[in-house]
Structures are given as C-alpha cells and as structure tokens.
C-alpha cells in the first residue's frame, strides 16, 4: 500500500492531510506517502516546517518525515520499490 499525491485542489490536500494525520496518530499503520511535483508541494511543506513546526510546535520533527517529495516517475518508482513489500 502506498499513497501518491499529485498537484491538486482542496480535495487532494484534504486527502493528504487525512492520511498523514491517521499515520501520525497511529490510527493506521505507517504507509509510504509520496508527494509528486516539488514545485507544487515545497511551498506548503516550507510553511509546515516554518510555521506549524518551528513557530508553533504543533507537530514533531518526525512528523515531517511521514512523506517524501519526488519530481520524476523514476524517483517515485524507486521509492515505492524500496519501501513497499507485497
């Protein structure tokens, strides 16, 4: 099982945050979460790191490691092969 999110709107963001929250709170087992497209995701992730983590301490540093950002199909494929077992 793996979750791969591509750039999208509120629905995509909702789904990403829902899965990240479920993994963070251990409501579901840890699964690989891939965010595809650095140009799209990095501004949001920078906000999370700067504001949510550093300024407000609302999450732990380990929570920012729940997901991986990739910028190519090859990177996504390599990550899946390395982190998903059947």
Can you annotate each of these PLM segments?
Residues 58-86:
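A charged, well-structured terminal subsegment
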Residues 1-69:
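Conserved phosphate- and dinucleotide-binding cores of soluble alpha/beta proteins
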